[in-house]
Amino acid sequence: MKSLLFTLAVFMLLAQLVSGNWYVKKCLNDVGICKKKCKPGEMHIKNGWATCGKQRDCCVPADRRANYPAFCVQTKTTRTSTVTAKTTLMVTTASMSSMAPTPVSPTG
């Protein structure tokens, strides 16, 4: 019985001394991995909901990038795209205001 307790204690201590981490923290619905610095082929995501904390980025490997294209696309904001987006928003708002609901009487 003493040898069993000793063996258990040794394994518990060795688990604390392992240089690597047996638990790799995942992010973005288990697609990405939390790292301090992403590799050149990986896409990094700096969103607060990615659950990596302030010091780490969510790194998504290139082979898994197709699973979440909306989050892993590098976008460039230019002046023309901003103007186009504002124009689209104004047109959408104007068309929605013209679709005001008409009152319907409950008696039919």
Swiss-Prot record:
Question: According to its UniProt record, where is this protein mainly located?
Answer: secreted
User: Which subcellular locations apply to this protein?
Assistant: Secreted
Please state the span of the N-terminal signal peptide per the UniProt entry: 1-20
- What about PTM? O-glycosylated; glycans contain alpha(2,3)-linked sialic acids.
Which cellular component appears as one GO term in the record? extracellular region
Source organism, top-level taxon:
Eukaryota
- The region called In vitro binds to LPS, mediates antimicrobial activity and inhibits LPS-mediated inflammation is annotated at 21-63
Disulfide bridge map = C27-C58, C34-C52, C38-C59
- Which Gene Ontology BP terms does the record give? defense response to Gram-negative bacterium; single fertilization
Q: What are the UniProt keywords, alphabetically?
A: Antibiotic, Antimicrobial, Cleavage on pair of basic residues, Defensin, Disulfide bond, Fertilization, Secreted, Signal
Role, per record: Highly glycosylated atypical beta-defensin involved in several aspects of sperm function. Facilitates sperm transport in the female reproductive tract and contributes to sperm protection against immunodetection; both functions are probably implicating the negative surface charge provided by its O-linked oligosaccharides in the sperm glycocalyx. Involved in binding of sperm to oviductal epithelial cells to form a sperm reservoir until ovulation.
Q: Which family does it belong to?
A: Belongs to the beta-defensin family.
Q: Check the record and name the PANTHER family matching this protein.
A: BETA-DEFENSIN 123, BETA-DEFENSIN 123-RELATED
Subunit info here reads:
Homodimer or homooligomer; disulfide-linked.
Descriptive protein name: Beta-defensin 126
